[in-house]
Amino acid sequence: MTPAIEVVGVEKRYGQFIALAGISLSIAQGEFFALLGPNGAGKTTLISALAGLTRVSAGKLRVMGHDVVSDYRAARRALGIVPQEIVFDPFFSVRETLRFQAGYFGIARGVALDSWIDELLAKLSLTDKADQNMRQLSGGMKRRVLVAQALVHRPPVIVLDEPTAGVDVELRQTLWAFVRELNAAGHTILLTTHYLEEAQQLCSRIAMMKLGKIVAMDTTDHLLNAFSERVLRVKINGELPPSQMQVRTRQTGAWHHFAIHDLSEVETRLAALREAGAHITNLEVAEPDLEEVFVNVMNK
């Protein structure tokens, strides 16, 4: 099957500065894929290149098999982008904005388009704002309109560039519920976010960028297991026996932390503590965390 997004040996230079250093990746149709990295890693440059807004210095980019340069109309038609910045035309209502956006892709006005716009407005809780001027909306409402704009031409591939930056919890939950529906319906989702828990919960595969390069790329589960460990936290009444000091990784008050690779090690560690004379009053197991993985990868 043709990849939804294909990036082959992409480089982008601004004079002596290298923004993208030979990036290659392939995202399958129907994937929910995260692209993570610190500010300046090259994520937005890569997205701009996919959208045809930035010409790369070398390499090829394709969306649903369409080259973003030689077949740019088809590539752009297959792509819907929710930008990081809130950009809007202050002279039009929400409904007018969506109609104009659809027109840019050659979609004629009519019952079919209006029905789809009404469905988008309902899904994004914008129905009561449909005829309001864009400048009258709150920041969160404007961001919902950006999502609707990205979807109004029904693209199979959707790019979300920091879609929940600066929005409240209610909007975040509403947006992710809708995006999950889109992914379940077969849409390919490419997400960039600094909320790593979102990427961990939503995405099946993750790539991490640093200084214009991909420094890690794998399934979410494999990344969590490769770069992070479960932690057994044990609360002990009294001092930790000296024989257990050297295997403890950290102490927080009365809680002692021990790294474990899998759950089968829990009873082994507890038995060793009891045998050494430790009086255990409480315990918990912390699962691997994407934030820890991210920090470990960036510090390598």
Label the predicted regions.
Residues W176-I260:
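ABC transporter nucleotide-binding domain
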Residues E229-K300:
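Short, charged/small-residue-rich alpha-helical element at the C-terminal edge
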Residues N133-L137:
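Conserved ABC ATPase signature
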Residues I158-D161:
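Catalytic Walker B motif of ABC-type/P-loop ATPase nucleotide-binding domains
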Residues G59-S70, A74-A75:
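Conserved ABC transporter NBD signature motif
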Residues R99, G103-G106, V111-K129:
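Conserved ABC ATPase "signature" region
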Residues V152-P156:
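A short, proline-enriched helix->beta-strand linker immediately N-terminal to the Walker B motif
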